[in-house]
Amino acid sequence: MDTLLKTPNNLEFLNPHHGFAVKASTFRSEKHHNFGSRKFCETLGRSVCVKGSSSALLELVPETKKENLDFELPMYDPSKGVVVDLAVVGGGPAGLAVAQQVSEAGLSVCSIDPNPKLIWPNNYGVWVDEFEAMDLLDCLDATWSGAAVYIDDNTAKDLHRPYGRVNRKQLKSKMMQKCIMNGVKFHQAKVIKVIHEESKSMLICNDGITIQATVVLDATGFSRSLVQYDKPYNPGYQVAYGILAEVEEHPFDVNKMVFMDWRDSHLKNNTDLKERNSRIPTFLYAMPFSSNRIFLEETSLVARPGLRIDDIQERMVARLNHLGIKVKSIEEDEHCLIPMGGPLPVLPQRVVGIGGTAGMVHPSTGYMVARTLAAAPVVANAIIQYLGSERSHSGNELSTAVWKDLWPIERRRQREFFCFGMDILLKLDLPATRRFFDAFFDLEPRYWHGFLSSRLFLPELIVFGLSLFSHASNTSRFEIMTKGTVPLVNMINNLLQDKE
C-alpha cells in the first residue's frame, strides 16, 4: 500500500502539489498474543489512553514540521530561453528517478516543484527484495526479518519475506545529489498550464515563468492536472490514519512487522462500531522500531466511497486501548488517501506520466513506490532513445513511444486483473475478507509475492487465480463466484477490447 495525500490534521479529497506521497503497507508479529481485557482512562500528563474518542489522541499530534534538505540547488535560468530536453513536473521519488537517469545520458533536464528541498513527509514501506533489486538497500532505515498477518483471534500467518521502511531523507538526498552532478536544473513553482507546439511544449508556472521543453513528464501524483483522462473517474479509495509514536510498551515482536491485523475483539463492547467494521473492515498495520517506538496505522483496504477519517481514528483508538498501548507522545501523524483502480489516462497523449497520475498504483493493494521506481528506467530509456535518435521526431511521436513502453499490453492486462481483484474486495465484509486472505497467504510464496509486487502477468495471474480458488474454503469459493461474476465478465470484455 503506497500512495497518499497528507494534510496536517484533516483528510481532504484535494489535489496535491507536485510530487506524490505514498502509504506504507501493514504487517504484524509472529505470535498470537492474548491481551485480555483492561480498563483504561484518560490521564493528565504525557501518557494518554482514551475510550470512545480520538480527541485525546489527536491532542498529542505535534504541529506539522517541514524538514528541508540542507544544500543549494542549481536553479533554472529563464533569461536564457533554452529548450530543455525534459521537464519533470513533480519532485517525488518517481519524478526524481527519471530526471536522474535522463540527465545521466547527457540530456538537459529541469525539475519543477513548489518545494524541491522538502523531505517527503510520509512513511514508505517496501519489501526488501524490491529495493535490493534496484540497489537501494542503503535507503532503508529499518528492516524486519518477516511480517505477520492476523486473520482473526485464532489464526495468524507468518510471512517469511523481509520488509523495510524507506529512509525518506536518504533516498531524496541520494537522488537529488545525482541530479545535481548530472546538471539538472530546478525551478521552484507550480505548473498551471501546458501549451503544446509541434516540436516543443511550453509550461506556464504560477510565478509567471514559462519553461520550454521537448518532453513533459507529469509526476504530480493524483492531481491529474496535466495528464488527461477521457473516461469517468470512479476509483476505490484506500484511507488510513497513522502515527509514529513513543509508547510505554507494545505487544509486538520487534523483529517482525504487522502486515495486516483483521482481528476485531477490540470492538466487542461497541455494537455500532463493530457493525460498521463488519460491513467495511479496517486492519492494523504496524512497524515496531523498538520496545517503545512504533508506527501504527489503521487502514481501510479499499472502499467506494472511502471511509471517513474520524471513523478510522475511532477504530484505531479502540484497538490501542484493547492492546494496552499507552501513547506518550506522537512524532508525526499522517492521513492517507489512495485512489485505486479506475481508468487509465488517455493512451497515448502529449504529456507523459509516471506514478499516480499514470494509473500505476496497484488496484488491489495500494502499493506504488517500488513499482514506479522500477518503471523509471523504462520511461527514462524511452526518452533517451527517441531524443537521441538521428531522425527527428515530433512531440506526439515521442510521447507515443514513451507511453507505449510504460504501458505495454502485458502491463495493461495485468492491471485489468488487479482491478478485477479490487472489485471483489470492494464487496467483501469482514468475515469474507478474512476468508479471502486466509486463502491468499496460504498460496505458494511465489504467487502472493508476485501479486503484491506486480511481478505476475496474465498467464501467471490466471494460474494464481485458480490456485487461490482451490485453497479457498467452500464458503469463500461461493463468495468469489457470486460477488466476482460481474467483475469477471467486465474484465474479460475489457481484455478483449484492448488491442496492441
Swiss-Prot record:
InterPro entries assigned to the protein according to its UniProt record, in alphabetical order: FAD/NAD-bd_sf (IPR036188), Lycopene_cyclase_b/e (IPR010108)
Localization recorded for this chain is: Plastid, Chloroplast
Single GO BP term? carotene biosynthetic process
Record flagged with keyword Repeat: no
Organism name: Solanum lycopersicum (Tomato)
- Pathway terms, separated by semicolons: Carotenoid biosynthesis; beta-carotene biosynthesis; Carotenoid biosynthesis; beta-zeacarotene biosynthesis
Q: Where does NAD(+) bind?
A: 86-114
Sample GO molecular function, one term: lycopene beta cyclase activity
Q: Where is the transit peptide?
A: 1-81
Record carries keyword Cytoplasm: no
Membrane-spanning parts: none
Q: Which reaction does it catalyse?
A: a carotenoid psi-end group = a carotenoid beta-end derivative
Write down the EC number.
Answer: 5.5.1.19
Physiological role: Catalyzes the double cyclization reaction which converts lycopene to beta-carotene and neurosporene to beta-zeacarotene.
Q: What is this protein's record name?
A: Lycopene beta cyclase, chloroplastic
Gene Ontology CC: chloroplast; mitochondrion
Query: Keywords assigned by UniProt?
Result: Carotenoid biosynthesis, Chloroplast, Isomerase, NAD, Plastid, Transit peptide
- What protein family does this chain belong to? Belongs to the lycopene cyclase family.
Q: Which PANTHER family match?
A: OS02G0190600 PROTEIN, PTHR39757
Please state what class of enzyme this protein is.
Answer: isomerase
